[in-house]
């Protein structure tokens, strides 16, 4: 009881301190009064920091201003929508907003402000606290750092990373290329720290009571590092293939492997008191609905995951159907309120990486000739693992299916109707060209990663797959976002232009293009460069 009281007391103080360090320039202004000795009690300080970081990736902890709404701005009204997964069902902002590329700065800046205000300071402090004394926790911190911050650079491009706490270098931002190369260095450090500790203390599981992503076992964290390295290596496959292959070679030389089984993966557990913010938006706020893309592909494929991912329409005229909303429809009515909502509840674990995703990454690596694995086997294992993850068996018929996506028919306005864009079926054909094979791999990976929109949006931008419907209306400023090419990134927070113009100029310079949603990121080449 005493330990629990101390833990909760320190957690409250630490959350307060995080809320007081809003600007990354003032990251070290800790007003909590917590001493290093306080944080050492039962290792609570280390666990509390890592707990905050774990809750801050799929963001949902209360730093004093409530829960759930930060996630809506950080992810749901951006990546979850741009990925082709979801759409809001209410006329937010009068019906015109990010959906039709009338980009809202308050929404677009949320990832930046929350990560730099509340998560990166804890990462920095955890690194310093564990570097020389707690190698396993240091390794875990590094993995969480990469998992958290790759989502930030995948939104914006250049970020403040290596110089986050470096006043002498004026917190100079890094180009995305440099950030990614540093990610790989961070994962190197993590693997060395963890594997060394495991060899020294193979039975140790001291982090288990703080672990809300994995099973508390350190070998699982090495698997996470390897799987994350593979994800990031494939992200740069088109722009830096030699570096990508070199990183994959490192994984081959590691004995711990990847996430493979349907029970493997990194998910934020709700058994710890964490609640899924998407579930709150979905079940309580009634603001998340199936997208037209999900309807087109899942209904067209007769995919058995359809009834697990989404609920049937509540509109009596659409009884027994799964129907979605097309992005960019600009509606100021409630006619879509009876369409299909998500299955996600507040108690649903929040996925960050699944074993099925890793199988599809392995399929692409094999397709590119970078491993000696069989691309078809990896592809089929990816589909099978996804099915089993949701308790679905009998995948054989699906893997032989030649069904295609269906046309989208709007339930209210026929002007929103559009022919199916996705032209591939689930069945693998060894005679297909490499581009068609890649489209099948990424389309199935997109289905399997649901509802994790950050990764889905990043991969859709990188590869162009699945082929999504263009927005019905495009209200981007000065036509900065092309309707067919679609939104490529989020702009930097608008407040930087007035509050820190020097920093803003440095970020735009590192971007190498205009600060709007039409500018491609470093890894977004527009060509998959399949040899």
Where are these regions (language model features)?
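Beta-strand acidic-aromatic groove motif in beta-rich domains, primarily in extracellular
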Residues: 62-73, 158-159, 245, 453-458
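TM-lumen/periplasm interface segments of multi-pass membrane proteins
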Residues: 60-105
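Bacterial Sec-dependent N-terminal signal peptides
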Residues: 1-29
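Membrane-proximal, proline-rich intrinsically disordered regions
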Residues: 20-79, 125, 466, 478-531
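C-terminal functional modules
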Residues: 387, 391-531
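Structured, solvent-exposed acidic/aromatic patches
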Residues: 88-396, 431-436
């Amino acid at each position: 009881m005493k330990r629990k009281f101390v833990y909760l007391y320190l957690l409250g103080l630490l959350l307060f301190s995080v809320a007081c360090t809003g600007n990354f320039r003032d990251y070290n202004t800790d007003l909590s009064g917590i001493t290093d000795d306080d944080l050492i009690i039962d290792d609570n300080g280390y666990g509390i920091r890592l707990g905050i970081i774990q809750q801050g990736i799929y963001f949902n902890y209360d730093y004093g201003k409530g829960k759930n709404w930060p996630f809506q701005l950080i992810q749901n009204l951006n990546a979850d929508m741009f990925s082709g997964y979801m759409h809001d069902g209410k006329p937010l902002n009068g019906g015109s907003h990010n959906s039709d590329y009338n980009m809202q700065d308050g929404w677009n800046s949320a990832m930046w402000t929350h990560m730099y205000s509340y998560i990166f300071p804890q990462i920095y402090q955890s690194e310093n606290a564990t570097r020389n004394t707690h190698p396993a926790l240091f390794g875990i911190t590094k993995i969480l750092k990469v998992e958290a911050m790759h989502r930030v650079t995948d939104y914006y491009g250049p970020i403040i990373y290596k110089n986050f706490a470096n006043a002498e270098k004026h917190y100079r931002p890094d180009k995305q290329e440099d950030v990614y190369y540093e990610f790989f260095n961070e994962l190197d450090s993590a693997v060395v720290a963890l594997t060394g500790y495991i060899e020294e203390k193979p039975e140790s599981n001291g982090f288990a009571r703080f672990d809300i992503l994995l099973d508390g076992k350190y070998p699982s964290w090495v698997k996470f590092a390897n799987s994350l390295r593979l994800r990031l290596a494939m992200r740069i496959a088109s722009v830096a293939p030699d570096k990508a292959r070199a990183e994959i070679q490192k994984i081959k030389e590691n004995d711990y492997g990847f996430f493979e089984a349907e029970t493997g993966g990194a998910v934020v557990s709700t058994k710890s008191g964490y609640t899924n913010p998407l579930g709150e938006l979905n079940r309580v706020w009634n603001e998340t609905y199936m997208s037209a893309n999900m309807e087109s592909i899942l209904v067209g494929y007769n995919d058995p995951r359809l009834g697990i991912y989404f609920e049937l329409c509540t509109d009596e005229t659409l009884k027994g159907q799964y129907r979605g909303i097309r992005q960019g429809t600009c509606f100021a009515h409630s006619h879509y309120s009876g369409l299909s909502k998500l299955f996600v509840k507040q108690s649903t674990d929040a996925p960050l990486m699944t074993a099925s995703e890793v199988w599809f990454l392995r399929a692409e690596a094999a397709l590119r000739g970078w491993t000696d694995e069989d691309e078809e086997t990896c592809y089929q294992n990816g589909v099978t693992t996804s099915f089993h993850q949701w308790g679905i068996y009998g995948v054989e018929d699906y893997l032989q299916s030649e069904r295609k996506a269906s046309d989208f028919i709007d339930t209210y306005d026929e002007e929103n109707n559009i022919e199916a864009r996705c032209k591939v079926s689930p069945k693998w054909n060894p005679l297909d060209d490499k581009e068609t094979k890649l489209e099948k791999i990424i389309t199935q990976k997109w289905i399997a990663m649901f509802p994790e929109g950050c990764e889905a949006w990043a991969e859709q931008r990188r590869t162009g797959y699945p082929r999504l419907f263009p927005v019905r209306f495009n209200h981007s400023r000065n036509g900065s976002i092309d309707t067919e090419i679609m939104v490529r990134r989020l702009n930097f927070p608008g407040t930087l232009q007035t509050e820190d113009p020097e920093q803003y100029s440095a970020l735009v310079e590192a971007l190498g293009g205009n600060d709007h949603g039409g500018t491609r990121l470093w890894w977004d080449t527009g060509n998959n460069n399949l040899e």
